[in-house]
Amino acid sequence: YDVMLIMREIQPFDTLDFCNILSITKEQFEKRGIPCELADVLNFASDKASAYGRRIYIWSTVRAKKVFAGAYRVGRVISSARLKSPVYFANALYADKLCSYITENGYDTVVMPHLFPAEAMTWLQRQHKLEVQTYFIATDYTCIPFTEETKVDYYFIPHEELATEFIKRGIPAEKLVPTGIPVSERFLQLPGKREARVQLGIPVDKSCILMMTGSMGYGRVENMTAKLVEQTGEDTHLYILGGTNEELKKTLRDRYADTERVHVLDFTTEAHLYMAAADILFTKPGGLTSTEAVAAKVALVHTKPIPGCEDRNVAFFTQHGMSVSGDTEDAVIQKGLKLLRDPEAQAEMRKCQEKYGKPYAADAVCEFICGQKEAAEAAQKKA
């Protein structure tokens, strides 16, 4: 059977959580000999929609955080399992084109980590236009607005403790599967800290702070860097993964050109090695990055989130001892430096990450989907 993995691509491929999660899931299916295709759902709406959506997303998260936060709150208020939102009807507009593509290419399973394709597939199934198995992967540690107005066969959620929230929002309990959020196998096969540092050329006799800014360099990275440099000594090196934000990287490189312990790096495919090498990690609380950090078992400090679902990510991680954070930038830095200087606290955090993390989620997702397919085929033969 064939699997179609549908995302909403709003950043360059390999830099967005949705894209990464589907790439990871695709690898697991292909290991089992199951062909897959990745698709950007808005390509079915128009050729320009994906690029436009990407620009709007970047503007809303970098330039208009308050607007984004307000929209998220409004979404929670108007979202309902019974009444359909404008989001639902907007995604219904291209659903027929999506339906034709799925039918013509013979796909019988659709996997989605984003609301938009889930809304479109819901419309198709309500109109009885398409008979395929559908699966939604939640990519944050909360039930995001409008999830409850979707109707798919199963919802893969990050943790069983979140089931109550999804049920309260209207998702049937029997449709919830607490697999975790899929992460790459690279995070499951990490070298030790010393070996990772040797591979990356990081001093083995210094403290190492890793800062991940996100693919767009979101957040007040310049201020945080200045404060971390000011409050640490020559025995502490700071490695900044600058993502695709060229302006940010140039600013930092110019400012710290004469500071040998500040290293500003371009987009890298070796984030897993940097996590393995680091003593502590400062990162924005995205669902995938946070899950990767737990899989890597690195002491985790969450910076100020994008308003909305990332606030819920911080709450889940801090309540379970898997990260520390603060209400202000200064509080975040102070908690991070305290963690850096406390090996026992780091060890305790790793124990919590071991207890609550689900590093084998990608395998669990694929195994569940394959199991459902096999069960359906067996039932059909009996009939």
Which positions does each model-derived feature cover?
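Conserved N-terminal ligand/cofactor-binding loop architecture of enzyme catalytic domains
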Residues: 23-101
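A nucleotide-sugar donor-handling region in carbohydrate enzymes
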Residues: 153-215, 245-247
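Donor-nucleotide binding loops and adjacent catalytic segments primarily
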Residues: 193-195, 202-278
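Acidic donor-binding loop of glycosyltransferase active sites
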Residues: 276-286
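A short alpha->beta transition loop at the rim of the catalytic pocket in nucleotide-sugar-dependent
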Residues: 278-279, 297-299
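A short, well-ordered alpha-helix in the C-terminal region of glycosyltransferases
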Residues: 345-359
